[in-house]
Amino acid sequence: AITFEEEEEALKISNDVEYGLTGYIWTNNVTRALRFSDELEAGMIWVNSENVRHLPTPFGGIKSSGIGRDGGDWSFEFYMEQKHIGFATGNHQIPKLGK
């Protein structure tokens, strides 16, 4: 086990690695879990659980663990280019600037 005195030290130890696929937080303090998970450099984080993954959720890491996410609907974005197309379906007035 790696020991630490303060939460900041635990976060520094956790983030001071080359990889960032997943992280685990064990605590009874929900506020601490939310704060720590926000700062933890990992693509997937479990709180009081060990690698129980719902398959449609995104899978992937950061740093040397890779970029992007795979799994579920998140996979599609890797293989596609998004484009916005807006259609006016009614007869509407286009405002004239300066009038």
Where are these regions (language model features)?
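Conserved C-terminal structural/oligomerization subdomain of aldehyde/semialdehyde dehydrogenase
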Residues: 1-99
